[in-house]
Amino acid sequence: MSHRVLLVDALNLVRRVFEARGGAGDEEFVASCSQSLQRTMTELAPTHGVVVWDSSEPTWRHLLDDRYKANRDPTPPVLVNLIPGLIQRFESIGISSLTIENYEADDVIATLAAGVASNHGEAVILSTDKMFYPLLIQGVRIYHQFERRFVDVDEVQAKFGLNIDQLVDYWALSGDNSNNIKGLPGVGKKTAIDLLNRHGDIQTMLQRNDIKKLANAADEVRRCQQLVALKQDVALGINLKDFRLN
């Protein structure tokens, strides 16, 4: 492959370091985040890389459903105040940052990763967020920084009891508590797995008239699909060469 692109889920990285340290001690915390990222860059030897941050403004998902992530505590103010210093420190080790207004980092990363993979490059996402798993079937790789290993397709399919390409429909049906997405009433994890193993996908289920759980629920389940699926068409206005690493 001509290039390996490292796509860093910024808040996933820094919040885990923050929690592991029991808080942020300004310079020591910034240094720990920088050292952690630099170690991974040394291990993976990417040719390109970018640290992607969430927009500070409400995203399109919040507009679609105002309950989205409403169950989460806000990012601690002390951590928010350290973000400019983190961006500066990351730039000092040669990797720049990116934020796209009204989009979460996940959508920006998914767009970048899909673009790299479709052009025969190797996209490596640095994150522990399960919502990236559906990208595995597109040739995208996911690296678990704190366990220092790549996520394996077979491992994910065994964990969920489903194929990778069924995960979006699984979360749409059963919900996703971490993002406060409720899913369909009366459909838990076991029922969602059973429905998908029998029918394959939501589209097939909606074409039937004998699945009581989905009766009169087409609009709701499609809304849930929108919420859990990562966008891969965010208008970025950037070029891969902007993220070339030395």
Predicted feature residues:
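Extended two-metal-dependent nuclease catalytic cores across DNA- and RNA-processing enzymes
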Residues: 71-238
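Short, intrinsically disordered, charge-balanced linker/junction segments flanking boundaries
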Residues: 242-246
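Domain-level signal for Mg2+-assisted phosphodiester chemistry and nucleotide/NA-binding surfaces
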Residues: 1-94, 147, 240
